[in-house]
Amino acid sequence: TNYAGQILMFNNPRDSYGIALKKLGYSQNTTNRDELDQATDELKKQKLLIQAYVMDEIFPKMTAGEAALAPYYAGDAVTMIGDNPDLDFVVPKEGTNRFVDAMVVPKSSPNKDLAEQFINFMLEEDVALANIEYIGYSTPMSNVKARLDEEVQNSFSYPDDEVLSRCETFVNLDEETTAYLQDSWTGVLSYGDSSIGDILFLAVFFLFLIGIVIYFTVKKHRNHTI
């Protein structure tokens, strides 16, 4: 509650439920409805503290100091901390999502050979080094990592085995679970909105009643005066 109104949250169900499930000690890939429902309850409680549900907007908001806490990607965190030294990046003790970016060639690609040549080019040591230094994300190439400056080889870009043991990689969920997550997420986003609407309705209703009372009081007074 110390950060109420200063927290940003991912605006998509997969990431948000992954965070809630990890907090509860469950797998972020669970299909268990009871566990998903518990995560829904956690997200609804969290909504009272949220400033905004966003995605890419996390980058400029955190860099500008418009929020205090937000989930985001380790590679972008390198750039964000460079822009705002007051920021830091931590992996929760419960763990987090371990993601992998990859270059692939569509099966139907009309330029398969050219695409493979481009991938080979990006994997050349000097090119890969320049790419990693520019984008801030980590490299799987040990020869490239060895050439990085020590400050670049920081703990959150290249976490140790203990941290990785607490992380999971997202897997594709079945269609039924995906639909259930989406419906549940819609419920999270709309949670509390109806109560606000009810309050506004009652406020307008009472103002209307007060207006009627005033109208007839004034009218009665005028008639009595006449």
Sequence positions of predicted segments:
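Mature extracytoplasmic/periplasmic domains
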Residues: 106-166
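A ligand-binding cleft/hinge motif common to bilobed small-molecule-binding domains
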Residues: 63-64, 69-86
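Conserved C-terminal helix/tail region of periplasmic/extracytoplasmic solute-binding proteins
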Residues: 162-226
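Extracytoplasmic ligand-binding site segments that recognize negatively charged/polar headgroups
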Residues: 1-66
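Ligand-binding "clamshell"
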Residues: 79-91, 150-155
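Periplasmic-binding protein-like
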Residues: 36-44, 83-107
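Short, hydrophobic alpha-helical packing/hinge segments within bilobed ligand-binding/sensory domains
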Residues: 58-61, 77, 115, 128
